[in-house]
Swiss-Prot record:
Disruption phenotype: Mutants are partially insensitive to body touch.
InterPro entries: Atat (IPR038746), GNAT_ATAT (IPR007965)
Residue span(s) of domain N-acetyltransferase: 1-177
Family indicated by similarity: Belongs to the acetyltransferase ATAT1 family.
Name the record gives this protein: Alpha-tubulin N-acetyltransferase 1
Key words of the record: Acyltransferase, Transferase
Length: 262
């Protein structure tokens, strides 16, 4: 993405971290337009109607943009080569054994390298710089609805070959869950603030299996005192519809029997 201006006084180094405050302080329409146009190319590659990244969205969010650019001394132009947008989100994740984890994790929300700069190491330079600034390891990163190309990139550059898809379209890697337990005597640190809930929820093929603790509410028709306690509630689709119909009739009867307020 070419800009007919010298952006060195505005952006500074060729790898730059732009948090919302820094983006707002730029106050340069040329830079704003260049970043927005680069984000439009990213959206076009993903076949999206609207771009995921704009300077306006960055200013009004908690996301951070890592931008790679350079100044061409011969042609006297600046070139924006690529970017990565990241942000921290609280996620509920499931490993391959359907055990649940929750916590705040760094998410890659948008990632793009200009077609004229691809296969030149620009993408890895951006992510390596981002990892160093965010104090995060590659296996601790979550990907927001990644493309096959991005998954292949993470596999080739960082050796992350076992993606675990989530029902929220986020993807994490198996190493994230292995970090919570010692494997072969080597323990990797999990992301800050991560923990495994005491009542994990398992999502299968349309069914939700919840394991309750010993001190679960007694007497509740769908909660027992012991783990794996039998459930006597009618959980079939027909039963659920019948329960909702009965509740609707009860509410209607209550409304009709109530005294008017006027």
């Amino acid at each position: 993405m070419q800009v007919d201006a010298d952006l060195r006084p505005i952006l500074g180094p060729q790898l730059v971290r732009l948090d919302p405050m820094r983006v707002k302080q730029l106050q340069d329409p040329i830079v704003y337009e260049a970043i927005d146009n680069l984000a439009k190319l990213s959206a076009h590659c993903l076949q999206l109607r609207t771009p995921l990244t704009t300077c306006e969205k960055l200013i009004n969010s908690d996301s951070t943009l890592y931008l790679s650019w350079k100044y061409d001394e011969e042609e006297k132009v600046s070139r924006l080569m690529g970017f990565a947008k990241v942000g921290r989100k609280k996620l509920f994740l499931y490993d391959s054994q359907m055990q649940t984890y929750e916590g705040e994790i760094l998410c890659l929300l948008d990632f793009y390298v200009h077609f004229s700069c691809q296969r030149q190491g620009v993408g890895q330079q951006i992510l390596d710089y981002m990892f160093s600034q965010e104090h995060t390891e590659p296996y601790q990163l979550a990907l927001d609805n990644p493309s096959v190309t991005l998954l292949g990139f993470m596999s080739q550059k960082y050796g992350l070959i076992k993606p675990v898809w989530q029902n929220t379209n986020f993807v994490v890697f198996e190493e994230l869950f292995l970090a919570l337990s010692a494997e072969n005597g080597i323990e990797k640190p999990p992301p800050d603030g991560w923990r495994r809930p005491m009542t994990p929820r398992r999502l299968g093929t349309g069914m939700t299996d919840t394991r309750w603790l010993q001190h679960a509410v007694s007497g509740h028709q769908s909660k027992g005192n012991a783990m794996a306690a039998p459930v006597d509630a009618d959980m079939t689709p027909q039963g659920a519809l019948s329960n909702r119909a009965h509740q609707a009739k009860a509410r209607k009867a209550h409304i009709l029997s109530s005294k008017p307020l006027w």
